[in-house]
């Protein structure tokens, strides 16, 4: 049978398109997980900076308190300039990439420097560490006219009309900040609290809320608020509320919420390796793994009985165990390896946060059937 010939005229555009796609893939800056700021390394710094765009670079350390305070402002800046063609917003972790920071004279954190287009000679930024001031600086130095992006808040705003319906909901765990607009400590907490709300925005059973206690004094007095900010936790089983006396860094809040609400998030809002796991079903999965096929059917039946006892998100996650066990019975144990690899490929793609949650939970449960 004759093999059909492909015209060079048809293949050339295909090769050109492929080459363009590859060039874009290799040229595209590496954005840090969970934000809109380009994460630079020792190997990528001079490939990105000093080229055909101006760059604002923050040199930071993960443990630095001033860097943590700057983070939400800098991320807001990054989101605003993400689509700008002539400038970009970047950062370097100086704990991980010491040689870069040393080369550019960084001796304290955070250090913010402007690198003009085509130059590796920086200009140190000495202004205020707010998104507004930084944007004005970048627009002046880079010749741009970018407006700051409006980032929708994930904090639920409470008042007399909705306080009881939200806070006293027996199906939800609520953290409430009672604040005053003029309070300095409240202003310091605000970006951290906003970040916390963003971390749990996909968890229906968790609500991060605040109340202007200066404006709504009756509600503040009802719950014994005498100073600002006061944080109170209203869990499903205690709608009288309990004082939150922990630390006020994002790590502290995330640890508290995970422990109290049974969630499994990190500070970037991503699910951890424990998300979706249920101890009683993990034990049955291990038993299932080591059993012969006939015995596996009996264990599957035990799993189904266990899942019936669960409620809320645990019941939903329990169904994942059942589905995986049935797939293994139908397709053999290779299913776990192939499905895990498929999920890992999907997680590398651009997918919605809710879909990423779904895939991570399934991947976590699969791990109990494969170890």
UniProtKB/Swiss-Prot annotation:
Task: Tell me its EC number(s), please.
Answer: 5.3.4.1
Its BP terms in the Gene Ontology are:
protein folding
Active site residues per record: 64, 67, 183, 186
Keyword entries, A-Z: Disulfide bond, Isomerase, Redox-active center, Repeat, Secreted, Signal
Q: Which SUPFAM superfamilies match?
A: ERP29 C domain-like, Thioredoxin-like
Q: Which NCBIfam families match?
A: pdi_dom
* Record protein name field: Protein disulfide isomerase-like 2-2
> Species name for this entry?
Oryza sativa subsp. japonica (Rice)
State the encoding gene.
Answer: PDIL2-2
């Amino acid at each position: 049978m004759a093999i059909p010939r492909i015209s060079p005229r048809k293949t050339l555009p295909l090769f050109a398109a492929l080459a363009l796609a590859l060039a874009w893939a290799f040229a595209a800056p590496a954005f840090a997980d969970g934000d809109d700021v380009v994460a630079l390394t020792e190997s990528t710094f001079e490939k990105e900076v000093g080229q055909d765009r101006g760059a604002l670079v923050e040199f930071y350390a993960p443990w630095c308190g001033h860097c943590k305070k700057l983070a939400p402002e800098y991320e807001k800046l990054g989101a605003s300039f993400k689509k700008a063609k002539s400038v970009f917003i970047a950062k370097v972790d100086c704990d991980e990439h010491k040689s870069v920071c040393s080369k550019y004279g960084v001796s304290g954190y955070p250090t913010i420097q402007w690198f003009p287009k085509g130059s590796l000679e920086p200009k140190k930024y000495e202004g205020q560490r707010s998104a507004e001031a930084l944007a004005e600086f970048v627009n002046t130095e880079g010749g741009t006219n970018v407006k700051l992006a409006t980032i929708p808040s994930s904090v639920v705003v409470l008042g007399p009309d909705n306080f009881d319906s939200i806070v006293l909901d027996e199906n939800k765990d609520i953290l409430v900040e009672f604040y005053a607009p003029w309070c300095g400590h409240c202003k310091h907490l605000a970006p951290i609290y906003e970040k916390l709300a963003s971390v749990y925005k996909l968890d229906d059973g968790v609500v991060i809320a605040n109340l202007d206690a200066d404006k709504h004094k009756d509600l503040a007095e009802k719950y014994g608020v005498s100073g600002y900010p006061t944080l109170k936790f209203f869990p499903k089983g205690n709608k009288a509320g309990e004082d939150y006396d922990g630390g006020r860094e994002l790590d502290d809040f995330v640890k508290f919420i995970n422990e109290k609400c049974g969630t499994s998030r990190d500070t970037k809002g991503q699910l951890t390796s424990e998300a979706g796991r249920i101890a009683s079903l993990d034990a049955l999965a291990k038993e299932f793994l080591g059993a012969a096929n006939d015995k596996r059917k009996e264990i599957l039946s035990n799993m189904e009985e266990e899942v019936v006892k669960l409620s809320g998100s645990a019941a939903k996650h329990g169904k994942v165990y059942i589905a995986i066990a049935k797939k293994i019975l139908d397709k053999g144990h290779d299913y776990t390896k192939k499905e895990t690899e498929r999920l890992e490929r999907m997680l590398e793609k651009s997918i919605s946060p809710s879909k990423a949650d779904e895939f991570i939970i399934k991947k976590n449960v699969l791990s109990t059937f494969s170890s």
